[in-house]
Amino acid sequence: MASENMTPQDYIGHHLNNLQLDLRTFSLVDPHNPPATFWTINIDSMFFSVVLGLLFLVLFRSVAKKATSGVPGKFQTAIELVIGFVNGSVKDMYHGKSKLIAPLALTIFVWVFLMNLMDLLPIDLLPYIAEHVLGLPALRVVPSADVNVTLSMALGVFILILFYSIKMKGIGGFTKELTLQPFNHWAFIPVNLILEGVSLLSKPVSLGLRLFGNMYAGELIFILIAGLLPWWSQWILNVPWAIFHILIITLQAFIFMVLTIVYLSMASEEH
């Protein structure tokens, strides 16, 4: 619910501000007067990303330690279904030989899903606690709605793409792939390099921006509903959108995982 002291524009802007740390002075940034500098980090995005990553590790480790060959509990059954689903996806889409891909795909799917799931929390709950209890100037709780987080994850995937490309094809083979495709003639090397370079770089960019765009839009719609409508009518739109958003949350985690598997499978193909 929007604060009585805020206009709808102020309310929306307030919820789109990150809690930032200026690395030059190690002080919190005033969200209403941010410095024009590269040396800031969104510590709320980093905090929730790390906490949710640790939550994933704790939950899955606890299930693995308590796993039984008898009749599993509901939580163990759910975890086994997720693992089986991810493992099946990897077997269907990854045609190379690597023990890293399945754990990586599982980590990506669950971690991104948990980050996306934060979007279903009441929009004012944690920011209110942060402001009135902890005295923080701003707080955003959806890490995947921060382009820095999604592009950082995509950068990690890009590094793996380069690693597997060089590992499977060698530096010479990878160089030939960039310079002699699609036109297999030395005269077209500059053209091939541009085309293949753009194609290669577009993978992490599109991977990161796709997740960011969908989650940012979802977060913004929740903020608009809370900021522009009276409290008694917000449920009329909030509940249907939240139900639909559950599909978006799961789908975006799945798409990020699938594209990662596909890109790494392409990088692992020997020519």
UniProtKB/Swiss-Prot annotation:
Record GO biological process: proton motive force-driven plasma membrane ATP synthesis
GO cellular component, one term: proton-transporting ATP synthase complex
Main location: membrane
Segments passing through the bilayer: 40-60, 100-120, 146-166, 220-240, 242-262
Membrane topology summary: Multi-pass membrane protein
A Pfam family assignment: ATP-synt_A
Keywords on record: ATP synthesis, Cell inner membrane, Cell membrane, CF(0), Hydrogen ion transport, Ion transport, Membrane, Transmembrane, Transmembrane helix, Transport
InterPro entries, per database record: ATP_syn_F0_a_bact/chloroplast (IPR045082), ATP_synth_F0_asu (IPR000568), ATP_synth_F0_asu_AS (IPR023011), F0_ATP_A_sf (IPR035908)
Cell compartments where the protein resides: Cell inner membrane
Superkingdom: Bacteria
Keyword Transmembrane helix carried by entry: yes
Gene Ontology terms for molecular function: proton-transporting ATP synthase activity, rotational mechanism
Sequence similarity: Belongs to the ATPase A chain family.
PANTHER family tied to this protein: ATP SYNTHASE SUBUNIT A, CHLOROPLASTIC
Subunit structure: F-type ATPases have 2 components, CF(1) - the catalytic core - and CF(0) - the membrane proton channel. CF(1) has five subunits: alpha(3), beta(3), gamma(1), delta(1), epsilon(1). CF(0) has three main subunits: a(1), b(2) and c(9-12). The alpha and beta chains form an alternating ring which encloses part of the gamma chain. CF(1) is attached to CF(0) by a central stalk formed by the gamma and epsilon chains, while a peripheral stalk is formed by the delta and b chains.
General function of this protein: Key component of the proton channel; it plays a direct role in the translocation of protons across the membrane.
Name of protein: ATP synthase subunit a
Organism expressing this protein natively: Escherichia coli O1:K1 / APEC
